[in-house]
Amino acid sequence: MHGVNDPPLFIKDIKAGLKNLNVVFIVLEIGRVTKTKDGHEVRSCKVADRTGSITISVWDEIGGLIQTGDIIRLTRGYASMWKGCLTLYTGRGGELQKIGEFCMVYSEVPNFSEPNPDYRGQQNRVVQNEQKDKMNTSIFGTVGNGVQTGPESRGYPLQYGRSNGPGPISPQLPGEPSNQTVRTTISNARDPRRAFKR
């Protein structure tokens, strides 16, 4: 966390979740206005300092006052991920103060608001793990006291999933000979009926 009197933070040091940020930047581009459901105007502006660039989201009338080339000091801002991109916001009690025009050393690269594949990968892994957890949770399994329920609890191994051949998957009862032949299918996961035609 940074206080109001702390020296400005460089854009390269901004991370999602940081609050009370003080940043000095030059406005490079002003995006088109979008309106929220409740009537607020939002502009996304590309801003930069000497360490790189980032997108700042500016709300309502203040967004209409900002112009390309303005040098601005943001106080009490915060950073967050929006649609996989690091974005800067003014926050509650945050201020944007114009302190100059045009004369500032800056670099457009790296753009820290570019979609972050590492972040997207982390989000995808989280979603996949949640889906896996939901799939593993079924009406069978262990009860809170550790007792196994379902067909497995009676000593019958039950196969879940798809079979490799026609017909249903049926449990093999203990002591019975297997009447199913095991077929191994190798697939590249493409449906041959949907082959690309040139």
Curated annotation (Swiss-Prot):
Q: What is its main location?
A: nucleus
Region labeled Disordered — which residues? 142-198
Tell me, how does this one assemble? Component of the SOSS complex, composed of SOSS-B (SOSS-B1/NABP2 or SOSS-B2/NABP1), SOSS-A/INTS3 and SOSS-C/INIP. SOSS complexes containing SOSS-B1/NABP2 are more abundant than complexes containing SOSS-B2/NABP1.
Q: Where is the composition biased (Polar residues)?
A: 142-151, 177-188
Quote the subcellular location field of this record.
Answer: Nucleus
For this protein, the record's SUPFAM superfamilies field holds:
Nucleic acid-binding proteins (SSF50249)
Source organism of the structure: Rattus norvegicus
Give the Gene3D superfamilies listed for this entry: Nucleic acid-binding proteins
Any keyword DNA-binding? yes
Q: Which residues bind DNA?
A: 26-89
> Family, per the entry?
Belongs to the SOSS-B family. SOSS-B2 subfamily.
Please give one Gene Ontology molecular function term for this protein: single-stranded DNA binding
Q: What does this protein do?
A: Component of the SOSS complex, a multiprotein complex that functions downstream of the MRN complex to promote DNA repair and G2/M checkpoint. In the SOSS complex, acts as a sensor of single-stranded DNA that binds to single-stranded DNA, in particular to polypyrimidines. The SOSS complex associates with DNA lesions and influences diverse endpoints in the cellular DNA damage response including cell-cycle checkpoint activation, recombinational repair and maintenance of genomic stability.
Q: What is this protein called?
A: SOSS complex subunit B2
Per the record, its GO cellular-component terms are: chromosome, telomeric region; nucleus; site of double-strand break; SOSS complex
Keywords for the protein's UniProt record, in alphabetical order: DNA damage, DNA repair, DNA-binding, Nucleus
Q: Which GO terms describe its biological process?
A: DNA damage response; DNA repair; double-strand break repair via homologous recombination; mitotic G2/M transition checkpoint; response to ionizing radiation
